[in-house]
A protein has these predicted regions:
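Aromatic- and glycine-rich beta-strand/loop motifs that create alpha-glucan
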Residues: 1-25
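Hydrophobic alpha-helical transmembrane segments of multi-pass membrane transport/permease proteins
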Residues: 19-41, 56-59, 165-176, 202-209
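Membrane-interfacial helix-loop-helix connectors in multipass membrane proteins
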Residues: 39-50, 114-135, 181-195, 220
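Long, hydrophobic alpha-helical segments
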Residues: 51-67, 71
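Transmembrane helix boundary and interhelical loop/hinge segments in multi-pass membrane proteins
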Residues: 64-84
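Hydrophobic alpha-helical transmembrane segments that constitute the membrane-spanning cores
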Residues: 95-120, 140, 144, 177-178
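A structural motif at transmembrane helix-loop-helix junctions in multipass membrane proteins
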Residues: 128, 133-167, 218-222
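Junction motif at the cytosolic side of a transmembrane helix
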Residues: 205-222
Length: 222
């Protein structure tokens, strides 16, 4: 197994164990979606209209909740220093850690979306559209959030700084994710533009995120 594959497998295994963060994100996502019908009342039409936004907001907050452990656990046990000084390019290591985080914490949210959509009175087409937009957009949340996680890892009260840094960068993803979901529900003809922008945001974050995170780690750990 290559060093890259070993790093991804290790991070997934750590995230999936008790206290690793992946389960916390899924439970938080479930809690947000389950509580919303009680807060909005028995209006099923209102639930269906707000359903995509609720699912996207829950996914955003759940992702933010687990991002603080992206580098923190490695920093606490000293393995982050080994990663920084290792032979593998740090940018590639950051990309591998972000991919492992998305597989462990982001992908389960997408899998749970069709079931949770039933609680929001969404039909099969609507839940499928939301799941597709989450599949395209949640990588942007992870790779953008990785930059904030790298900046916060060496700072006191880094979790608060992480929220301040990541939330503004996540707003475009949230806007176009909800817009694409609503467009797919309204009619497929208007789905292409916001969905294409959402995919572009993920691709841009995939390119920029590892380099920005690696630079932050090098500067913070010097």
């Amino acid at each position: 197994m290559t060093a890259l594959g070993a790093l991804i497998k290790r991070d997934i295994r750590i995230a999936l164990r008790v206290g690793g963060g992946a389960l916390i994100g899924v439970l938080f996502f479930l809690t947000v979606v389950v509580l919303m019908p009680f807060a909005l009342g028995p209006d099923l039409a209102l639930l269906a209209r707000l359903g995509p936004a609720i699912l996207w907001l829950g996914a955003l907050l759940a992702s933010l909740l687990t991002l603080d452990r992206l580098f923190m656990a490695d920093h606490e046990d000293g393995s982050l220093d080994l990663i920084v000084m290792g032979r593998m390019p740090l940018e590639l290591a950051c990309a591998a850690k972000a991919l492992a985080h998305w597989l462990a914490a982001g992908l389960p949210l997408i899998v749970a979306t069709p079931v949770l959509g039933l609680l929001l009175n969404l039909d099969t087409v609507s839940t499928s559209a939301v799941a597709l937009t989450l599949l395209a957009g949640t990588p942007a949340l992870t790779f953008t959030g990785m930059i904030g996680a790298a900046l916060a890892v060496t700072l006191h009260r880094g979790g608060l700084l992480l929220a301040v840094l990541v939330l503004p960068l996540s707003i475009p993803v949230l806007i176009f994710g909800v817009a694409a979901s609503q467009a797919a529900i309204a009619g497929p003809s208007s789905f292409g533009a916001p969905f294409s922008i959402l995919c572009a945001l993920s691709l841009v974050s995939f390119v920029i995120g590892p380099f920005a995170a690696a630079a932050s780690l090098r500067h913070g750990l010097d």
